[in-house]
Amino acid sequence: MKIAVYGKGGIGKSTTSCNISIALARRGKKVLQIGCDPKHDSTFTLTGFLIPTIIDTLQSKDYHYEDVWPEDVIYKGYGGVDCVEAGGPPAGAGCGGYVVGETVKLLKELNAFYEYDVILFDVLGDVVCGGFAAPLNYADYCIIITDNGFDALFAANRIAASVREKARTHPLRLAGLVGNRTSKRDLIDKYVEACPMPVLEVLPLIEDIRVSRVKGKTLFEMVETEKSLNYVCEFYLNIADQLLARPEGVVPNEVPDRELFSLLSDFYLNPVNTSNESTNSSIEANQEVESSFLII
């Protein structure tokens, strides 16, 4: 199974990807996570350091693939998850899609691409040009990471459009959305009502999820010394279980941009004000109590 993880920049894709990778490994699967970002920090919480990229390694070997060994590019991470960082071209030059293609080509040369039960591509931001949409060419499923915010859902909609386009020529399906670190999900529900797709999980606003990234650890590693975080790991295990069940997934029909803009902005500007309703109910109740005292 091959999974591509997308989402708005800074939404927590890498943190989520690393925890999902470990959750899949905990279910007995052999997992490889491939970071597809020039920052090459996708696997940081799995390995604890920034591992050398495939592009760096190929450059050092003058692009002689026959001189590259698996241990030159594949690093063992926490929980038995293998890690690869594709890297990227110099800033302002080259194409990220080419880098992803070279990464897959090298892994095939090393007979490593087909050795894993699950390969997870963690892809740069919400850039869905032909280059950074390249991992969708290899994926069985796409997962979109979002939160309950306007910008993240707008990006999710553009990614959904890319999935639909790639699904024309590849056996690709959208497995669903994952809400990350959000105290509410009303806007997520509003979006999936307009653009039907599964919601695999919504992780609550837990500060330890953000802190884990700073510590360079996954939640699964942190729970070894902080048992109170065990319940957080269950969210990722639930996502893993759904993926391993080989869901049918969907080919999404994205909402037109202007229509989505109106839908989401209207939800912000004209929210259902339940707080006012509850306040009015409290006032009415107090008035009834006061009246009863007057009668007595």
From Swiss-Prot:
EC number per UniProt: 1.3.7.7
GO BP: light-independent chlorophyll biosynthetic process; photosynthesis, dark reaction
Database matches in Gene3D superfamilies: P-loop containing nucleotide triphosphate hydrolases
Binding site for Mg(2+): 14
Entry cofactors: [4Fe-4S] cluster
This protein's UniProt keywords: 4Fe-4S, ATP-binding, Chlorophyll biosynthesis, Chloroplast, Iron, Iron-sulfur, Magnesium, Metal-binding, Nucleotide-binding, Oxidoreductase, Photosynthesis, Plastid
Cofactor: record remark: Binds 1 [4Fe-4S] cluster per dimer.
Pathway per the UniProt entry: Porphyrin-containing compound metabolism; chlorophyll biosynthesis (light-independent)
Catalytic activity: chlorophyllide a + oxidized 2[4Fe-4S]-[ferredoxin] + 2 ADP + 2 phosphate = protochlorophyllide a + reduced 2[4Fe-4S]-[ferredoxin] + 2 ATP + 2 H2O
One GO CC term on file: chloroplast
Keyword Chloroplast: yes
Annotated ATP binding sites: 10-15, 39, 180-181
Binding site for [4Fe-4S] cluster: 95, 129
Subcellular location: Plastid, Chloroplast
Pfam hit, one: Fer4_NifH
Subunit structure, interactors included: Homodimer. Protochlorophyllide reductase is composed of three subunits; ChlL, ChlN and ChlB.
The protein's role, per its UniProt record: Component of the dark-operative protochlorophyllide reductase (DPOR) that uses Mg-ATP and reduced ferredoxin to reduce ring D of protochlorophyllide (Pchlide) to form chlorophyllide a (Chlide). This reaction is light-independent. The L component serves as a unique electron donor to the NB-component of the complex, and binds Mg-ATP.
Family assignment from sequence similarity: Belongs to the NifH/BchL/ChlL family.
NCBIfam families: DPOR_bchL (TIGR01281)
Protein name: Light-independent protochlorophyllide reductase iron-sulfur ATP-binding protein
Taxonomic lineage: Eukaryota, Viridiplantae, Streptophyta, Mesostigmatophyceae, Mesostigmatales
Gene label: chlL
